């Protein structure tokens, strides 16, 4: 008789009262599935729970939260030995859920939980930044980063992903270029930029598709740079509607380095990182993740 998998679900504390998820967990437990639930309250909790999952010989670790929770769990999994590394499952419970949305993970709790436990396991890439930071979805710099990091929590709770767009319109006074230089294999660019996006996934900032051709299992990252030469109206149209912009600089690279004369801040799946130099490289097939068969981010 095939044993049911052991699953440890890591739940962001902000969503601890989600009744729909509680009911879904109860239903799967009645069906014989072993589910352990742990709740995070501060940074570092997810890493400890991943280590606990390995001690339990868990088959799955589920990140139940937003993009930041998924990031923290994925990063903790990536540094574990492959032989004992559980498979990642995702339940979208955040403000934007950009990675889950672009992967077409169900928003309904029972379907998402079932996928996270029983779905097809697929090798996927993640990205490493400056040898010690990670992202599974996207790193963004420039105006987009300032908007997503400074949007008030109450606005995000009330309006969801629309809060980022609204806050951007309120804060056009922040719109200023940052000078930097970017190079990678057969690629070099230098100048003033308003937005930089390095995507393993396709969208960030509450649904803005900044890297529309990115795939999570091709061993590459998609780079998109919006030059400060671009006029504001066209920039807004391209950013908010996803329309094609001929002044957007794009490349597909296994690694790249970004250097700047002044500090820049990049948002790594919601976590800010400030430096003058960033080395970003893809880690091919770094973890296994349970994704729907129709996931558009797979080759």
From Swiss-Prot:
The keyword Cytoplasm applies. Mg(2+) binds at residues 215, 218, 220. GO terms for biological process: phospholipid biosynthetic process. GO terms for molecular function: ATP binding; lipid kinase activity; magnesium ion binding. Gene3D superfamilies: 2.60.200.40, Probable inorganic polyphosphate/atp-NAD kinase, domain 1. HAMAP family: YegS. This is Probable lipid kinase YegS-like.
């Amino acid at each position: 008789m095939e044993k049911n998998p052991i699953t440890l679900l890591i739940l962001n504390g902000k969503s601890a009262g989600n009744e729909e998820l509680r009911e879904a967990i109860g239903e799967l437990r009645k069906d014989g599935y072993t589910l352990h639930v742990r709740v995070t309250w501060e940074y570092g909790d997810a890493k400890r729970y991943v280590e606990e999952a390995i001690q339990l010989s868990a088959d799955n670790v589920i990140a139940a939260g937003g993009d930041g929770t998924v990031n923290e769990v994925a990063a903790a999994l990536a540094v574990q030995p492959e032989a004992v590394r559980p498979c990642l499952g995702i339940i979208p419970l955040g403000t934007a859920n950009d990675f889950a949305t672009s992967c077409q993970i169900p928003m309904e709790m029972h379907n998402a939980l079932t996928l996270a436990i029983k779905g097809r396991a697929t090798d996927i890439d993640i990205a490493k930044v400056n040898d010690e930071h990670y992202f599974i979805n996207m790193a963004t710099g420039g105006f987009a980063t300032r908007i997503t990091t400074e949007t008030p929590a109450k606005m995000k709770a009330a309006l969801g992903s629309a809060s980022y767009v609204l806050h951007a319109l309120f804060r056009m006074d922040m719109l200023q270029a940052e000078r930097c230089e970017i190079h990678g294999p057969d690629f070099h660019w230098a100048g003033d930029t308003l937005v930089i996006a390095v995507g393993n996934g396709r969208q960030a900032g509450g649904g803005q598709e900044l890297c529309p051709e990115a795939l999570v299992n091709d061993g590459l990252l998609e780079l998109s740079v919006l030059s400060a030469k671009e006029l504001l109206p066209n920039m807004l149209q391209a950013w908010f509607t996803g329309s094609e912009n001929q002044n957007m600089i794009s490349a597909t690279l296994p690694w790249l380095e970004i250097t700047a004369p002044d500090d820049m801040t990049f948002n790594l799946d919601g976590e800010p990182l400030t430096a003058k130099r960033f080395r970003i490289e893809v880690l091919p097939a770094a973890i296994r993740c349970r994704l729907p068969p129709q996931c558009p981010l797979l080759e």
